[in-house]
Amino acid sequence: MAGEKDQSFFRNQVVADFGCGPRGSLCWATQARERIGIDVLADAYLHLGADRHNMRYVRSTESVIPLGDDSVDVLCTLNALDHVHNLPVICAELLRILKPGGTFIGSFNLNEPPTVTEPQTLTPEVLDQHLLRFLELKSRRQVPRGESSAYEHFFSATPAKAPAADAVQVLWVRGVKRGRN
């Protein structure tokens, strides 16, 4: 994940996935000290067999993630922030739980029109304002959304053409949280 050659990056780390979904998104991170899935539907996932994933599920709300300040070493969120109603509040919560010097890994679908289940239209400017400016970015890759797969341009040998600013795109970032916000 995020350009690491193996899982040793996660060794003895507390790793969390915000918007984890029901499928054990961190099952593979076996070298982590603790794996935490954070989701508003976490309680429901336990009834779907999530208790077999060898990770702790934590139910968040749209305004509170019930973890301590600076408690997470590696925080992932993959295509989840467009699902929240109050982006500034949840971004502040993500930054609160991530330790200074901790690694943030995120993927975001950009410029998609809002829907009932995805009420946010994320743009680079909105993400910079509420989240990314608090990180020292190590990598930032923004490509057009693929036609057959949202992520096809990340894995193809042919580089994508630069997208128009308002085109539907995918942004991947990896950064390190700066000192206290």
Language model region names:
Residues 63-75:
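A short acidic, Gly/Pro-enriched loop at the edge of an enzyme's catalytic core
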Residues 74-85:
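A short SAM/SAH-binding and catalytic strip from SAM-dependent methyltransferases
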Residues 148-181:
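Core SAM-dependent methyltransferase catalytic element
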Residues 16-64:
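Class I SAM-dependent methyltransferase SAM/SAH-binding core
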Residues 116-144:
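Conserved Class I S-adenosyl-L-methionine
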Residues 1-14:
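Conserved alpha-helix/loop element of class I SAM-dependent methyltransferases that forms part
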Residues 101-109:
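Conserved beta-strand signature within the Rossmann-like core of class I S-adenosyl-L-methionine
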Residues 88-100:
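A short glycine-rich, Lys/Arg-flanked "PGG" loop and its adjoining helix->strand segment in the class I
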